[in-house]
Amino acid sequence: EFLQVIQNRRTIYELSKKPILADDALVQYIRQLVKEAPSSFNVQSSRVVVLLGDQHSKYWNEIVPRAVSASVSDEALETMRPKLQNFAKAYGTILFFEDEKLIKTQQEQFPMFASGFPTWSLHASGMAQIYTWTGLEAVGYGANLQHYGNLTGEMLKKEYSLPESYRIQSEMVSVS
């Protein structure tokens, strides 16, 4: 059964806003999936912010284009705009972060392993992402993974009053 769910998990770009779970249930489900993902020394440094409704639309229609425009020409942004607008048609976006404060604490607590914690944090983030993607597939959602966070990370911290120690890893666009 698990193997079948993994085999069914694919990148889905045909986007819709059709809900499968109630918003509260979906957010709780995603948080539980991330919590169950293994992490080195059980650090549990992965964090998610789930954007639904207007916040999801704002991310793809305002925040990402504003961030991209600071890095590319207007012409390049206009070429990208249809892709970003397509992501806005999805049901929601899951922002994956790693909490660097927890990683630093582990480095201080276990100095002999200090150099490994940043890498292990990335492993944990990847596991949280695949657990989430596979878990969404299991209940009928599709998804695709995006990487605009290197451009939007600081804006997101301000927009959602996130801790300075949060480092964005990816965005998962979820569809039904």
Where are the regions a protein language model picked out?
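Conserved hydrophobic/aromatic beta-strand scaffold that supports enzyme active sites
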Residues: 5, 93-95, 171-173
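Small-aliphatic-rich amphipathic alpha-helix that forms the alpha element of a beta-alpha
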Residues: 30, 34, 100, 109-157
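Short, conserved acidic/polar surface loops in the N-terminal third of protein domains
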Residues: 60-62, 104-109
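Short, surface-exposed loop/helix-turn segments at secondary-structure junctions
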Residues: 67-74, 108-117, 160
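A glycine-rich helix N-cap at a beta->alpha junction
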Residues: 68-71, 84-86, 159-176
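Active-site-adjacent structural patch at catalytic or cofactor/ligand-binding sites
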Residues: 90-101
